[in-house]
Amino acid sequence: MNKMEHMEIKQLVVSMSLPIIISMVIQALYNIVDSIFVAKVSSDALTAVSLCYPVQTIMIAIACGTAVGFNTLLARYLGEKKFDYANNTMMHGILLGLVNGLVFLVLGLLFSNVFLSLFTSDQNVIPLANTYIRICTMFSFSVFVQIIFERIMQATGNAIYNMVMQGAGAIINIILDPILIFGWFGLPEMGVAGAAIATVIGQFCAMLIGYVITKVKIKELDIHMRNFSFSTPILCKIYKVGVPAILMQSVLSFMTVFMNMILAPISAMAITVFSVYYKLQNFLNMAVLGITNALIPIVAYNNGANRKDRAIEAIQFSMILSIFIMAVGTIVFQLFPKQLLAMFSANDQMYGLGIPALKIISLSFVFAGISMVLCAAFQALNKANTSLVITLARQLVILIPLTYGLMKCFGIHVGWYAFVVTEFICTMYSLFECRKMKR
């Protein structure tokens, strides 16, 4: 019995989204754990790590976008029982991960100073941020290859191993962070460098676990260079799907860069507050993204099978779940902003900027949840352009100019309302497009 067509919709959405949510939340832990421990070193150290966040998001965007194209092609060859092509595709994916890591190693060594100079001239912060960026980019091959192994497991129906791999990496990172940052057990106190080293060790261990699982458990595939034969068509097929996915994923990276540029003239602490907000909010985003990632194949399958009733029910139930998650998040941000900031060793300046920011921006959460679900539904129903327009408007086209204008004219606290206005406009547009489709 095909569960996509016959399993009860609520059970189907939950069963498919839960492993994805867990994997995504674990991924979000890397940055937030670093920030919590680094904040105990100094506010300059936290600012330094915050400035590096866009670099990490662009690496993840390229890794995940490449992996989307890779996963699509690998799954197709496995479905067609073309195992030689599948093995060659797998080897291309792993080698692409290594090449992408090499590119970021070079970029990190050559251009980290140029990148950081866009946001700050503080000589207390720049050396710390430089150290963090260079360590993370030097060993970035780990995260690129790790994400390829994740997609291998998804394509072969072994998604449960993702949680093992990512969970192990996150736990190693959490254990090593205080040891390396504060110099426990006789080790030298490394501060920001220790946080970066803990992160890359966690990612490297996760990559190794992914390799072992693929080698031992995935019987359909065989990791070996004898299965590799350079193929331009395979690369083109990977990036035909991968490039649009990279661009979609990169929107967040560009948004954080532009926001940092808007906030830099106000103060370095304003950048830190925004980074802390985004890392906290990312837990909610990851939960909703887990739901939407599960929703897309459910809606696409049932729409294709002419079971539009099930497709509509899946969208409605996903909407309810997302609104609930975002509403809970809004309540937490409204009632406990000081406690949330306290995790990052906040000082009076951070509280003064951060408490209003968390309270104001959180008013946009429910609208964001609705837009994210409808964007996923549009993708599943072959309305990818509509989804792209909404995503660009939410993250760049409306948000950035509106934030800049409000902050320039009325100050930073009023500027945060740009998030609320943007999400409201995009939700209204999403609902309008939804009504058009119903007609």
What kind of feature is each model-predicted range?
Residues 1-17, 74-141, 189-243, 299-364, ...:
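Short alpha-helical transmembrane segments in multi-pass integral membrane proteins
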Residues 4-36, 40-41, 57-69, 73, ...:
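N-terminal transmembrane alpha-helices
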Residues 15-34, 135, 146, 169, ...:
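Transmembrane helical elements of multi-pass membrane transporters/channels
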Residues 24-28, 61, 101, 105, ...:
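Residue-level hotspots within the lipid-embedded alpha helices of multi-pass solute transporters
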Residues 25, 29-47, 116-123, 179-190, ...:
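Helix-terminus/linker motif at the lipid-water interface of multi-pass membrane proteins
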Residues 46-109, 143-162, 271-331, 335, ...:
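Small-residue-rich hydrophobic transmembrane alpha-helices
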Residues 58-61, 173-178, 207-211, 283-286, ...:
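Hydrophobic transmembrane alpha-helices of multi-pass small-molecule transporters
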Residues 67, 136-154, 162-170, 195-208, ...:
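Short runs within selected transmembrane alpha-helices of multi-pass transporters and secretion channels
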